[in-house]
Amino acid sequence: SMIEQGWDVAIGHGNGPQVGFILRRSELSRHELHEVPLDFCGADTQGAIGYMLQQNLYNEFRKRGLDKQAVTVVTQVLVDRNDQAFQNPSKPIGSFMDQAEALHRREAEGWDVAEDAGRGWRRVVASPLPVRVVERDSVKDLIDRGMVVITVGGGGIPVVETEEGNLQGVAAVIDKDYASSLLATSIEADLFLISTAVEKVALNYGKPDQQWIAQMTAAEARRHMEAGHFAPGSMKPKIQAILWFLERGGKEAIITNPENIERALSGETGTRIIP
């Protein structure tokens, strides 16, 4: 519906479960095949999920008689090699292991491992902040030509610059909301829309005094975030991503669920956040 209304759209997406599946297949077959590096997992999922989105968009455009095309850009996102996240890897990935296997993988392969909430041991990797979308100019050019662009999938493939200025993949995971925020800023988007599992943002979510929010300013959103209303790993990174977008010149942002995007654009529902 956004595209029918004339919006030029760039689409980001997550890839957590899909990367998990690749890692699991890789672990199960490691006695016969080399394991897939984490940055390659990101690239693989960008291609596969991008293909699915492209195909479904093609079919929907055809159904609606729209003269539009969708294209996927395998997207690298630069991170700072000195980001403190690399000194404190905390993002669990892959399967659970017992302590003996975890310590063996640490010694043999240099993995960082940690016990995960008493359920076993897992590999942990850094989750650094995104600095620059490497393919930004290509994404912007495609949007300007009327393409629907699928990009920064899974937060983008994390890369660092070597001393020579070359790019090199790293074993890390970038938050998809943070990467999408950076992209929205860098292409000077008019609107940053986050599609999630709830129709609106709420204070005291899931409690008897839950309160849905139709609109709030950036200052109000920050105050609510600092008061602990938004859960880490859930709504909090979405609010933080929007705050960064608005602080860097963005005009407005919306949070809603997929089935209500059209109504949210017309102001009927969703949570609108403004500077």
List each model region and its residues.
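C-terminal catalytic "cap/lid" subdomain
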Residues: S1-P275
